[in-house]
A protein has these predicted regions:
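Hydrophobic packing positions in regular secondary-structure scaffolds
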Residues: 76-77, 99, 106-110, 120, ...
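Active-site alpha-helix of zinc metalloproteases
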Residues: 76, 80, 84
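Aromatic/histidine-rich interaction motifs
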Residues: 114
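Hydrophobic or amphipathic alpha-helical targeting/insertion segments
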Residues: 84-89, 93-111, 164, 188
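Short, solvent-exposed alpha-helical surface patches in well-structured domains
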Residues: 34-37, 108, 170, 287
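Nucleic-acid processing machinery
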Residues: 1-29, 43-51, 58-71, 79, ...
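Generic alpha-helical structural context detector
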Residues: 40, 66, 107-110
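Short, mixed-charge amphipathic alpha-helical segments
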Residues: 22-38, 94-104
Length: 321
């Protein structure tokens, strides 16, 4: 970490070129001149600030910008990520941002700043859910929320550098109750899962370690399980129905939720793998489901049809075990 901190501080051009390359790899149209201006504006204004990790503070907005690039957001959002802490930290004004980067980016930066100032009340999860709805309602531009989620994700990735345990726990709890559900609501399921996992490590470290050890044990005894079964599924399912088949290992937090919901002991947990089949149409999805159920028997209480009844955020799929 120290080596990276020194390198980032001494070679800002090197990291700008990395960001520029990442944007091009993701085929995002952008104003390179404005991007470079924002990058160095952030670097210069945060020059005297240091994060808990010992890194230059400007490495944080840089990391947030890269998260947004990987999500393929527009260049205005990426520039906003580079500038998102400047007003809040008092190193720039609205007028400066507006004059240098335009009205749209200034409004986005101002929106993220306002969102950062809203504090989660000391309430239970039920009320935290209402708070999530409140945040969604006040975000006039959904990009403001996505930038804030990326900001929280990077802060969670570096949470272990915070020495004060009570502060660390508060951030993790807030992430689990508010920001992870928000990520799910706007369709970023991978981000939601990572936020949950990072928060769970802090809010219940003992439970996390126990479950993670179980996952490692099952992983050790199921070498190449995912790749073998992806190949198996490809051989079973007709290719003209399917666009993509992938597999993944479930995370500790989702396993923990299942244990609580179904009152299952840790030793009984065996299904730590999930497979996703993306089809060309809804009709193809049901055809593939029929093929799968012909090969393997369905567990009745584990079937969910989110095509006929989509989730509130528009999510549509079929889940089966």
């Amino acid at each position: 970490m120290l080596k990276y901190a020194i390198d980032f501080a001494k070679k800002p051009e090197k990291y700008f070129l990395k960001l520029d390359k990442n944007i091009n790899l993701n085929n995002i149209s952008y104003d390179k001149k404005l991007l470079k201006k924002a990058y160095y504006f952030s670097f210069d204004r945060h020059l005297n600030q240091v994060r808990d990790s010992g890194e230059p503070f400007s490495s944080h907005p840089y990391a947030v910008a890269n998260i947004l690039v990987n999500l393929k957001l527009d260049y205005q959002s990426i520039i906003t990520a580079l500038l998102h802490d400047t007003i809040e930290d008092g190193v720039a004004t609205n007028e400066e941002i507006k004059k240098s980067f335009g009205t749209e980016i200034n409004q986005l930066v101002e929106g993220v700043t306002k969102l950062s100032k809203i504090q989660l009340p000391n309430t239970e999860i039920r009320e935290a859910s209402n708070f999530s709805k409140f945040i969604l309602a006040i975000c006039e531009d959904i990009r403001i929320l996505i930038i804030k989620l990326a900001d929280r994700l990077h802060n969670m990735r570096t949470l272990n550098y915070i020495k004060e345990e009570s502060r660390k726990f508060k951030i993790a709890k807030e992430t689990l109750e508010v920001y992870a559900p928000l990520a799910g609501r706007v369709g970023f399921q991978v981000m939601r899962e990572e936020l949950e996992e990072l928060a769970f490590k802090v809010t219940d470290a003992q439970a996390f370690q126990s479950i993670y050890k179980r996952i490692l044990f099952l992983r050790k005894h199921n070498v190449d399980f995912i790749s073998k079964n992806v190949l198996n599924l490809k051989n079973i399912v007709k290719s003209n129905y399917v666009k993509e088949i992938t597999g993944r290992e479930k995370r500790a937090y989702s396993t923990w939720k299942k244990m609580l919901k179904k009152s299952i002991a840790l030793e009984k947990i065996s299904d730590i793998y999930a497979f996703r089949i993306i089809t060309h149409s809804k009709e193809d999805c049901y055809k593939v489901l029929g093929i799968i159920h012909t090969k393997w028997s369905m567990i009745p209480d584990r079937f969910k049809d989110f095509i006929s009844t989509p989730k509130p955020n528009g999510y549509q799929s079929i889940h089966t075990t």
